[in-house]
């Protein structure tokens, strides 16, 4: 049985962490691509030398040539300019569209059948651009957003309630930005709804609202603390969870930026936006779940924000 091949486009902090986690999870051989000469090669050599210590036996290669992506089973894209203090995800739009064009063409010519996960921000627009330039079908391309946002929501809830984070089920829908929608109605702690926990006085509505707000600003909080970069451990872990579900046909239902068809969740056009999504060996399948009227209204605001950015991206491409 042939070993799987994971291509990581972008050898920065997220790319390097993705490579390390791929080896630890024993997902397959790794190709680390970057346009910076020496960077992917150096990180690949360092990672390769960790394999005897980690007890794994996989190949790790660094490259500046898109041809080395040939026959990749999974491609995870992190290439692009990261957020800096005071910069929104949307400020990155013009710069990273050009990056997605180069990456998309690299995928199209070398591994068009790969399962593609986009992590580059602004996420919902970049995954749309990546599909445009790569030609990858709807079921084989997805954006990493909701897994990370939901993990942040779960972390903050567990910390506030002083419970194991493994007992907290919490979900976030919508765009990967300030308009994301943490689903308080669907979220629970060991089966007990957040609404019930508020009634029992375990958490106040004010504290819950502040956690929702903190979740929306989760990435910005880390950017402000780091000052010279953005999050990478949790984003990489989220990307690997998605890749593993595909490679091992785990059929996990994860909140991801999948392409939903017009009519689903009230959208009037096909659109990449964060929704519950099954990831299996067949690719991605968006799933409809019932949400409250308030959450529907919030989701529509988020959808509109994504649509506006898509329009802005289209204008940039037209000029």
UniProtKB/Swiss-Prot annotation:
Any one GO MF annotation of this record: L-malate dehydrogenase (NAD+) activity
Name the UniProt record assigns to this protein: Malate dehydrogenase
Reactions catalysed, as given in the entry: (S)-malate + NAD(+) = oxaloacetate + NADH + H(+)
Gene transcribed to yield this protein: mdh
Organism this protein belongs to: Francisella philomiragia subsp. philomiragia (strain ATCC 25017 / CCUG 19701 / FSC 153 / O#319-036)
Residues annotated as the enzyme's active site: 176
Binding-site residues, substrate: 83, 89, 121, 152
Record-linked CDD domains: LDH-like_MDH
Role, per record: Catalyzes the reversible oxidation of malate to oxaloacetate.
